[in-house]
Amino acid sequence: MQLLCYFVILFVGIAPWSSLANDDGCNEVVCGSVVSKCLITQSCQCKLNDCHCCKDCLNCLGELYIECCGCLDMCPKHKDVLPSLTPRSEIGDIEGVPELFDTLTAEDDEGWSTIRFSMRAGFKQRVQGGASGDAGNGNGNGNAGSAGVTLCTVIYVNSCIRANKCRQQCESMGASSYRWFHDGCCECVGENCLNYGINESRCRGCPEDQDQLLTADTVPAEAEQDLERFFGNEEIEDEWGYGEEDEFS
């Protein structure tokens, strides 16, 4: 009787995994252990069209999300899936060293691409509750611009790296936060940035089939639009804009 119970339990535990293992994009060798864990913890017990468990599932699969989401039927099936239902990156805070980060990002480097864009005063006020003049009171570092304009500095590592390596590299550079994308792209974010920098994978060499390379002309506007969407203020005019817009034309 005990032997029969054992086989029943074994079958119940393996049957769901066996049916899922044949789904498109499921690497059984790589995903076996982590998928079993997520099944046991029931971290992925929902559908993309009702994704109340997406965050838990993402955390459970971790850096293997792209490789293993097919095993749990959690990969987007269409390109028009809502971005909120398509986890693209992992974020984290670091005990930053702004002076070090500003020094390292002041000049171009073979290992990363540096992007700077101005943060408008309205965003700082809505999120941090500061006065309009606070945004421009820089302490002499490379992230404070003239006329009250605060510059956000981010760097994109040129090569693909894993999530833990991304955090380590950003920490060693003195960044205040980081964003690691599930295609292997790593973004280190300076102290004056909101919403963990730019929510878009823009590493030059990662992934290899990337269609659009990083261009300084497009980043400021797109980064601002990303923040507009995040705070739901696409139609709201801020008190003032970038300042001297000619610099960005």
Curated annotation (Swiss-Prot):
Family, per entry: Belongs to the twisted gastrulation protein family.
Subunit structure comment from the entry: Component of a complex composed of dpp, sog and tsg.
GO cellular component: extracellular region; extracellular space
Record-given protein name: Protein twisted gastrulation
Keyword list, A-Z: Developmental protein, Glycoprotein, Secreted, Signal
Keyword set includes Glycoprotein: yes
Organism expressing this protein natively: Drosophila melanogaster (Fruit fly)
One Gene Ontology biological process: negative regulation of BMP signaling pathway
